[in-house]
Amino acid sequence: MKISIITATWNSGATLRDTMESVLSQTYPDIEHIIVDGGSLDNTMEIVRELEPQYHGRLRYVSEQDKGLYDAMNKGLKMATGDIVGILNSDDFYTNEKVLEKVSKALDNKIIDAV
């Protein structure tokens, strides 16, 4: 079961590295991370490009003006190819490396329907 994580950004250079590294640290193997940037004026996209090689093809991103957070999230949803879609804000991060693995198992075992 593939998991798509969508992160909308705008001038998130101060926090995005922690967000991306928390996705990279996940033990669940079938993840794509989609970053939709609203045309940041800071170093947001430099961080994305710097960390891109560590994703080994599992990172997709776009940087262009949008109409705000929900427009960015909708763009991310259109780009997503996962069976499960999650939202991770650009100033949030997963507190441990097994979060997505646990979510996947809970959904597979019908313990939960949504998170």
Identify the residue ranges that each predicted region occupies.
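Short aromatic/hydrophobic "clamp" motif used to bind/position activated sugar donors
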Residues: 85
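Conserved donor NDP-sugar-binding/catalytic core segment of glycosyltransferases
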Residues: 97-115
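Catalytic phosphate/metal-binding cores of nucleic-acid and nucleotide-processing enzymes, i.e., regions
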Residues: 61
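N-proximal low-complexity "stem/linker" segments adjacent to membrane-targeting elements
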Residues: 1-25
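Acidic helix N-cap motif at the loop->helix transition within catalytic regions
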Residues: 14-17, 42-51
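Acidic metal-phosphate-binding loop of nucleotide-sugar-dependent transferases
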Residues: 67, 92-94
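Glycine-rich, basic loop-to-helix element that forms the pyrophosphate-binding segment
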Residues: 64-80
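A conserved acidic beta->alpha catalytic loop
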Residues: 29, 37-46, 89
